[in-house]
Amino acid sequence: MKSARAQPDAPRLLAWLPLLLALLFSAVTLLPELRAVANLNDDAFHFLLVQGADGALSGGANPFDFWSPVLELGFPQFLYYQHLPHLSIVLMQRLLLGHVSLITVFNLVRYLLLVGFPLTVFWSLRKLNFSHAGAITAATLAPFFAGNFGYGFEYDSYVWRGFGMYTQIWAMHLSFICLALLCDYLERGKNRVPAVLALAALILSHLVYAYMMAISAAVLFAVGLTRSNARQRSLRFALVWTLSALITCYFWLPFILSKVYLGASPYLQRWKYDSFGAQAILQRLASGDLFDHGRLPVMTALVATGLLAAALTRTRQAVLAGALFVTWLLLYFGRVTWGSLLDLLPMHECLIMHRFIGGVDMAALLLIAVGAGWLWQFCGRWQPGRQTPVFVLLTLLLMLPALVERHGFYRLNDVFLDRSARAVDQDEGAATLIERLRTLPPGRTFAGLRTDWGKDMKFGDLAFSDLLTLNQIPAVSAPYQSLSLNADLLWDFDYRNPDDYLVFNVRYVVAPSLEPMPGFLKRLQTAGRYTLYEAESGGHFALGRSDLAFEGRQSELLGAARAWHARALGAAGEFPRVALKGMQAPPSDLVSLPLADAPRQLGGFAAPPLPAGSIAAQSAQSQRYSASVQLQDPAMLVLKVSYHPNWQATVDGVPVPTVMLLPSYIGIELRPGAHEVVVAYRSQTVRNLLIAFGLALLVLLVVLARPRKTPGFSRWP
């Protein structure tokens, strides 16, 4: 009896072999990603956010909205940046009772998400009613995209030598899960609450992919639309998106209302906004370079097979896959092809269209499932009794070029990672100075940029500034994301100019010991091949004046700030007021000049003498700064951190307004006399109320999803 029952199970077990091999391959080749090494890519930024959320929670601050002082002269990243993936790490580490370090949990979650991606693809495709053979094949090939660092599903986007796009790993999983659950709800009315939760999680994990999911969901909605189901399908579609939007409104609503304080770097390459155009993308697709860079175009061939099968079979799954692929391929062409037509898209002005490759990759996996299912049927007609072995052999043969290419890629990744890890471990001087910096009084640290000797302070592929980020040491360094309005001005910092140390509050410098340094720097310590210097920075506060006022667009701010910096007006104590379009600036007696005209206006401006007075004492914490000030003249007290209205100031215990000053600093007007000034970061009350509302709605949905005897709830659309 046992052998008779086991016999039909043998082909089914054999069919899983390619997927198991893919999982094992990823599990082994990605093991180096578990090493606790500083990151040289955006994962350094992501882990800094994890550390910041953990510190905020430990210190009694709001983990959903806190000030991070380390990069870009400070910024409240979680107010604008997707944060569920980061908060999840903090929660997991606490569930482990702190026995496992944050960086270990961070790397482990990254590793498991990368290794487990095929399982999410398989589950989602089966939920979408793709064939078993097609789902297994697509899941098997899911981790084997090779796009030559194209920012898509290829693991080049995630590994140590890649881009470190941690939140996109979550978005890959959630995009498939959302599509599957949405389909289930729209078609059968099942999984309403899981669909809402998945969409909400995607919104909080990756805004661009949530935007892309809205477009994919519209395609899904249209593919299954008939005259008989139009009303019910429309109600379900509207309900699931409305509920997910309400749950996450604490994030996207304040984001929209205060986006004027979010930087938009002019240094970001134009192709990231515009994409590459139809000709370049179609050439890459036809040559196999889009999915199979540097190897035989096996995935490209399966995508082509899927397109052919979709045209011939026209099943619901085939039509969905084909429609999604065409939609995303057309959108991926970007502004180079479509020009002003793309202005019809919501939020078109801030779309980074090169990331639409993610939609192309997701649709490609659906087409691979269609094509593989078609080949499975062909194998059944060709070899009726050997359908499974023949198909498995074909799949393994198709995997071989991908396995060879990916193995070479990951081996080089391991070489780079190991080289850098050993260099850091063997460099005792760097560790000594990092520990010294932890004990020194507050002040930012400069360890070079890519435009000066900073490029020579390397540990394999890591820079010294990467170690500063890992150790949460506030620094003037190359921006990772350019979220702050001050971020791009940091490229203008000149270590040879003593004024810049005052303007940016750079108190410490780490430089190569053999590098000639300016005489105004005081040597504190030499360790190994580095020397630590101290400069006169004036601290986080400065006394100044504000004799000019400008008003204009955010895009005009950097030009004004660079002109102000070039004229050394900050060191002279002149900090003009700035009101950006969309800001609510306090009233002023000054006449506002056009911000676009600031470079000309500042070029001929002579700063008046500094107001008489002094800063007797000052202190700095991550969420709070304070100063004791003695003034003989009216003055503007300047806090040299990025301006944001969530900073609330009190003078002698009385709340006072703050103003935005060039470059994007905080200003507080003071009268003559002795004053105690406190400036603290406070999350907006409305955002905290929206968080409570979202959590309450989430709990309510879960409760209502439980089986009930009351019939009314079961008749939701």
In which residue ranges do the predicted regions lie?
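Active-site-proximal, structured, solvent-exposed surfaces of multi-pass membrane proteins
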Residues: 590-709, 713-716
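Charged, low-complexity surface patches
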Residues: 39, 81, 114, 426, ...
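Short helix/loop capping segments that flank catalytic or ligand/cofactor-binding pockets
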Residues: 212, 254-255, 368, 455-456, ...
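A structural micro-motif
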Residues: 324-328, 443, 647, 654-656
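Extracytoplasmic
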Residues: 56-57, 119, 207, 400-632, ...
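Short, charged/polar, Gly/Pro-enriched secondary-structure boundary elements
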Residues: 352, 537-544, 637, 674-678
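A broad, low-specificity signal marking well-ordered, structured residues that form hydrophobic/aromatic
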Residues: 328, 357, 531, 625, ...
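Membrane-embedded transmembrane-helix bundle of lipid-linked glycan/lipid transferases
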Residues: 2-421, 432, 441, 508, ...
